[in-house]
Each structure stands twice: as structure tokens, then as C-alpha cells.
Design a protein with these regions (language model features):
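N-terminal, Lys/Arg- and Ser/Thr-rich interaction peptides
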Residues: 1-18
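Residues that form generic nucleotide/phosphate-binding pockets
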Residues: 10, 14, 35, 39, ...
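Non-transmembrane, amphipathic alpha-helical segments
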Residues: 17-24, 28, 160
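Residue-level signal for secondary-structure boundary elements
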Residues: 19, 41-44, 48-51, 179-187
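Short N-terminal edge-element motif at the start of the domain
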Residues: 24-67
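Hydrophobic-cavity lipid-handling domains and compact docking modules
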Residues: 57-143, 147-148, 152-153
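Glycine-rich, aromatic-bearing surface loops/beta-hairpins
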Residues: 132-224
Length: 224
């Protein structure tokens, strides 16, 4: 049977750890917001005398969201307010680093989404964005990134990699290059051949036929 001591011990151990992880993740997100703002200014200063029609815009949307718009794409960075552990079959739990201290597996999460800028501009509620990566941060500032292509292997040394300003800048760069190379494909004809009157009227008002970069897209880790 459980007693109050077991409850107190769990509160001291897990709850305290989660509070530390939340604080660490919030600090990282605040640094990420500053890095995104700096990135927008840096690229804009280079482009201003070379390309006139490439729009760049940084926007902070409250405590947990930040956007970086460049040309036709927008990266949305969202910090989740909860702290997570990993499912039993996740490879992180098999690492020596986590086995030495199982509380190291508790992580805060910053999700990275790619949306078409016009989807947000025109409030096209049917449009879809894509989760391209997730940054996991633990109580010791160790981190790894889970995502697609480069995002899945460039930042995966959880045991030895601590988050810092330089690595945040690199993550932003990789996300931007990945997004710019992830082009918009025209949908299959049969997927869009039927259009209701409702959709037609909505389209005439605000272009609300669903648009997304790909159909059937998955992160690389989902195919493992």
C-alpha cells in the first residue's frame, strides 16, 4: 500500500524535476525568440540591396509562439507548456546517459511547424502545415532534435549536447534551408476535381480550397 511518504517523495522527485525542466525550456524558447528576431534582421540587411521582393518578417505571438516568415513560407515555433517523458520503446531510454538517471528523460518540447505564408495571411482554415521538427530539452540543458532529413541526425547527441545560442542559430538555419527546399506541389487532379458550392463561394471570398505542400507526408522517424 502507498503512504504519504511515497507521495511526498514523488512530489519532491518528479514534480520538482518537471518544474526545473519547464524553466530551462522557457529560457531556451526566450533565447530562440531573440535568435529568430536577429536572423530576420541579418538576412533582411543582406537582401535589401540584392532582392527587392523577398518578404521577411519576425513575429512573436505571446508567451509560447514565434513566427519567422520568409517569402512564401512561415516557420512557427511553439513551446508546449507541459513536460513529457518518452514511451517505453523510445531509443533515448536505452542510452547510458538516461539509465544513469531516469529523470534525465523528462523533457520540455518546442515544436517547429512549416506553413504556407498565404495560409496564415488569408486565414485559410482548411490548409495544412507540417511538423518538421521537435526540440527536446531536459533538466541539464541537454537536448536533441527529432525531425525529418537533416533535423533527424544533426542534433541527436542527447548525452553530450547542451543547448546554446550557437546551436539555436544552426537549428534555425537548417529549418530555413529545409523549408526552402520543400517545394509546393500541385495536388493530384482527382483529389481536387470535386468542389462544392460552399467551397466555391468560400474560395471567391478568401481562397479557402485546402492547400498544403504534400499529401501523405511523414517525419522520417515515423518510417523507422
Amino acid at each position: 500500500m502507498y503512504n504519504e511518504d511515497s507521495i511526498v517523495n514523488l512530489l519532491k522527485e518528479k514534480s520538482a524535476t518537471k518544474q526545473i525542466v519547464y524553466s530551462k525550456t522557457k529560457d531556451v524558447f526566450n533565447k530562440l525568440v531573440l535568435a529568430l528576431n536577429k536572423k530576420e534582421k541579418s538576412i533582411a540587411s543582406v537582401l535589401k540591396d540584392q532582392v527587392k521582393n523577398v518578404e521577411l518578417e519576425f513575429k512573436s505571438n505571446g508567451e509560447f509562439d514565434a513566427q519567422l516568415k520568409f517569402a512564401g513560407d512561415t516557420l512557427l515555433f511553439h513551446m508546449h507548456s507541459n513536460i513529457f517523458d518518452f514511451p517505453p520503446n523510445h531509443h533515448i531510454l536505452n542510452s547510458k546517459y538516461v539509465k544513469e538517471d531516469n529523470l534525465r528523460s523528462f523533457c520540455g518540447v518546442i515544436n517547429i511547424y512549416n506553413f504556407l505564408s498565404d495560409s496564415l495571411k488569408y486565414n485559410r482554415l482548411n490548409d495544412e502545415g507540417f511538423l518538421i521538427g521537435r526540440i527536446f530539452i531536459n533538466k541539464e540543458d541537454n537536448f536533441f532534435v527529432e525531425g525529418d532529413k537533416e533535423l533527424d541526425f544533426l542534433f541527436n547527441d542527447f548525452a553530450n549536447q547542451k543547448i546554446n545560442d550557437e546551436l539555436l542559430d544552426q537549428i534555425i538555419n537548417v529549418c530555413m534551408v529545409y523549408t526552402l527546399n520543400f517545394d509546393l506541389y500541385t495536388p493530384n487532379f482527382n483529389d481536387v476535381r470535386l468542389v462544392s458550392v460552399h467551397h466555391l463561394l468560400a474560395m471567391s471570398m478568401n481562397q479557402k480550397i485546402k492547400t498544403s505542400k504534400r499529401l501523405g507526408y511523414k517525419l522520417s522517424h515515423e518510417n523507422k
